Amino acid sequence: MPVITLPDGSQRHYDHAVSPLDVALDIGPGLAKACIAGRVNGELVDASDKIDTDAQLAIITAKDEAGLEIIRHSCAHLLGHAIKQLWPDTKMAIGPVIDNGFYYDVDIDRTLTQEDIELLEKRMHELADTDYDVIKKKVSWQEARDAFAARGETYKMAILDENISRDDRPGLYHHEEYIDMCRGPHVPNMRFCHHFKLQKTSGAYWRGDSKNKMLQRIYGTAWADKKQLASYLQRLEEAAKRDHRKIGKQLDLYHMQEEAPGMVFWHNDGWTIFRELEAFVRMKLKSYQYQEVKGPFMMDRVMWEKTGHWENYKEAMFTTSSENREYCIKPMNCPGHVQIFNQGLKSYRDLPLRMAEFGSCHRNEPSGSLHGLMRVRGFTQDDAHIFCTEEQVRDEVNSCIKMVYDMYSTFGFEKIVVKLSTRPEKRIGSDEMWDRAEADLAAALTENNIEFDYQPGEGAFYGPKIEFTLHDCLDRAWQCGTVQLDFSLPGRLNASYVGESNERQVPVMIHRAILGSMERFIGILTEEFAGFFPTWLAPVQVVIMNITDTQSDYVNELTRKLQEAGIRVKADLRNEKIGFKIREHTLRRVPYMLVCGDKEVEAGKVAVRTRRGKDLGSLDVSEVISKLQQEIRSRSLHQLEE
């Protein structure tokens, strides 16, 4: 009979099959009350599942990440329970866990309003407050299908027909009169599901296919306790204030419109930020000894067939035809860079060759996934490809890592999560090649004192990769940087160099992106700084204002001086009260406001005020220019006197 080994190494012997809940109760009533599920030999199981052989067991509670995920999954079932009570003819599709919550896709004969969502959430709370038990039953495939057929659940029947083997025994979870199907595990009792909030609805095609019916997707968040939920909702409220779409409109940075979905219309101030960011990256490229190149906007489909993109990626590619030839608008820059590498004979002495491009790329993203600057169809990659020998990989990766941290630190990002994705089951190349490649990436990270986690099997078929994920001031994760080894593409496109032994060899290619998409990174920065861009990035760095018309000439003279000093400055000579002007430019997040009255004109000075409302007093014009130039040149994140 089973011997259960607990995480601390202690063992418990039983003369009968036991469940995780039985073991938890054996340990103590407190643990039994907290038990959500179990992890048996590394696999999550329901609290009620029986263990009849020797096993390693960990009791899962709400304090565990897995426990919180189970709570969220069960809240999706709770949503299903509630919606079927309110609108019994609703057909349930899928209800998975997502970051911070869950959603459920439903087929309902009404457009859900905010009032409906509030009513649904109220019913969910009423049901959860009864603390009913969730009963799991394993049944035959046919029994499951019959159960859903009797309820008219056509989507559940389709899942059974298309995704579940006839030999399988699906798990049916009974929430009183409501039944849902899932692999599980789920909470044993609804007392764990009291802290949730329904958030929004959207449209979603069944199985993500636009040829299928559009369903309504209901999103929710769920947490282990009241405090966690309140904290998350507060972060959401702050995120809403920082929404780059809202700030972009307030600051007149860009717009988008229906005639060009997913394409950005940059306005002057937004384009100023873009160009400053581009200039910063270009400076770093020069420092790290990259060539800058420019590839064509589109190439013949034949090229994309050679690379494998047409076979694996064509749904995301825009195409056009001319003179009986089909062209693909590039979704990425790498094939073009290989073509540039292939021009002229290369020797091992020419390597490493570092090639960078601000590449204008297009991808046919689903319209429903488009989101401001964060998810677009037309974007600019700060892309680079390094062609090198196998022996040079480690040093080149090391240099890439230094460049990543060098650039991220400029923007104040301190929390960077790093993951190393290793060989997948289906891959090209020998085990020896993968051993060396993975070891080189790991060694480069270690040499830079960077902590990282392995993601086994998550590498591309053509090579391992490092991913860099930024965490912003709200602790949201943004995956931006990538260092990816590629043992496939150079060979596919006949790239070669002459080695030391005078034989042609295929170079290793390193794909390197740091900001990722320039558009997306500007969106991230807009939300990180809440529109209060550091002075070097701010579209307008200084506004000079007069109090009356008598100071107009002085303001114009100062404006010219600051322009000559390389400072982005505007004069505001409008016949408005100075308080009105200050408020307007404060709302526009202009870093510095210089006020000129008769006293300042007479003394040859300016009254300096920051957008945060700090009065820096009356300063000499030359001193202001010098300090501003230093702040801009150093790309400081802080303003004067901060």
From Swiss-Prot:
Its EC number is 6.1.1.3. It is an enzyme of class 6 (ligase). Binds 1 zinc ion per subunit. One of its GO terms (molecular function) is ATP binding. Its cofactor is Zn(2+). Zn(2+) binds at C334, H385, H511. PROSITE patterns: AA_TRNA_LIGASE_II, TGS. Transmembrane segments: none annotated. One of its GO terms (cellular component) is cytosol. The keyword NADP does not apply. Residues 1-61 form the TGS domain. Keywords: Aminoacyl-tRNA synthetase, ATP-binding, Cytoplasm, Ligase, Metal-binding, Nucleotide-binding, Protein biosynthesis, RNA-binding, tRNA-binding, Zinc. InterPro entries: aa-tRNA-synt_IIb, aa-tRNA-synth_II, aa-tRNA-synth_II/BPL/LPL, Anticodon-bd, Anticodon-bd_dom_sf, Beta-grasp_dom_sf, TGS, TGS-like. It catalyses: tRNA(Thr) + L-threonine + ATP = L-threonyl-tRNA(Thr) + AMP + diphosphate + H(+). It comes from the Bacteria. The keyword Nucleotide-binding applies. Its main location: cytoplasm. It is found in: Cytoplasm. Residues 243-534 are annotated as: Catalytic. One of its GO terms (biological process) is threonyl-tRNA aminoacylation. Belongs to the class-II aminoacyl-tRNA synthetase family. Catalyzes the attachment of threonine to tRNA(Thr) in a two-step reaction: L-threonine is first activated by ATP to form Thr-AMP and then transferred to the acceptor end of tRNA(Thr). Also edits incorrectly charged L-seryl-tRNA(Thr). Homodimer. This is Threonine--tRNA ligase. The gene is thrS.
